[in-house]
Structures are given as C-alpha cells and as structure tokens.
Amino acid sequence: AYDQNREYLGCMKGSRIVGLLDGKSEEELCRWTDSLALEPVVRKVSARLPYRFVRLLLPSDSIALGELSFYTEEGRIGNVRIITPMRATGRNEVPGMITDGLGATGYRGRVAERLVDIDLGKEYMVSHIGMTSYLKTQLFCPDEFELRYWNNGWKTVERKQADHKGYLVFEKVPRGALLMLKNCRWKGKTAERIFTYEKGDVKWE
C-alpha cells in the first residue's frame, strides 16, 4: 500500500485549476506544483472574477483525489458537482466522492481528455481551494473494526465489519475526541490507528 499511496500522492503533481467563462479558460486560480501531502491542504486564491464553472487540468490521464473543495470568504461551497465523465479504476468509487465533504472517501480513475469540469452550482468569488490526498483503503472485508475514543482511557463506540465500500460510517461519536480505529483481527500496535476527525477530515496521529 505504501508504494501505491506514494504513486497516488504524486499523481496530482502539476495539476492546475482554472476559472471558466463561456466554456473557455479565463484565469488560473491555483497550481499544485508538488506531490499532495498526507494532510488536507487549503490554498488561498486571488480570483479576479466570480465563476460557476471551473476546470481541473491534469498532468496525465489519471486522477486520484480524496477531496476537492472550494471556499468563499463565508465558508465552504456546498453541492459541488463533477460534470466530466470518468472511468473509475478504484473499487466501488464514484466521482461524487471527490466533492462529498468526506476526506475518508475518494476517487481514482482515468480521464482521457486530462481535464475535469466542475459545477459550483452558481457563481462564486472563490477565495480558497483545498485538496485532500487519495489513500488506499485498509478496510478489507471480512475484517472487523472497533472505534474507540479517549476519556480517561479508551472507550468503545461501536464495532463494525468492513464491506465492499472501503470505508466505514460510525454514529454517535463524541465531537472533538481523540479516536482510535482498531483492526480486531490483527495483533500488536500496527492494528491500532489514532486520529482526530473534524469537519469531514480525518487527521492521523
């Protein structure tokens, strides 16, 4: 998984995002000159005009993203849609996972034209753009996973079995808590991952 993740992190190096007017590039909003970081990165944008449609220009025909987010000075733009057809290469993934607000989901695929058009829903003056890396899931069926939180010791939230989706959803999780995901089949410290979760982003410790 390490070599694959390194490949996914480098996949987006050289990507550019441009604002579109009448289907044509009007101005460059953001350029990602380096490989993506493991943690989400949000960059400031100096847009001259408001845009409804923006275009992600890829360095190759491959895309691998956990999340792509757009912001105004008032906050994150919701209901963002990918409108370019893509061919998935990850299991059970759809393009909407790039803009669903959940850093734990993601999408890996091929885009023959090396461009992805994105609909923000209406015109916005974009002030920031964020990217979250795509990482290979380690949640394989039929492994069971237990979510715990720290409160003067590790307390169990819930135990769930992984399925074909590649991610798990837990409910009634304490906000702002230090969390741990434990693979109940594995032994030793490698079976445990400590993290925090805030505003859709998983931050591994």
Model-derived regions, located:
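Disordered, acidic Ser/Thr/Pro-rich linker "stalks" and the adjacent N-terminal cap
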Residues: 1-50, 60-128, 134-141, 171, ...
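Short beta-strand segments within Ig-like beta-sandwich modules, predominantly Fibronectin type-III
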Residues: 33-36, 158-162
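Short, conserved beta-strand segments of beta-strand-rich sandwich/propeller modules, principally
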Residues: 51-55, 178
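Extended charged/polar low-complexity repeat regions
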Residues: 133-134, 163
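C-terminal end-helix/capping segment
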Residues: 149-150
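C-terminal beta-strand-rich structural cap/linker in extracellular carbohydrate-active enzymes
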Residues: 175-182
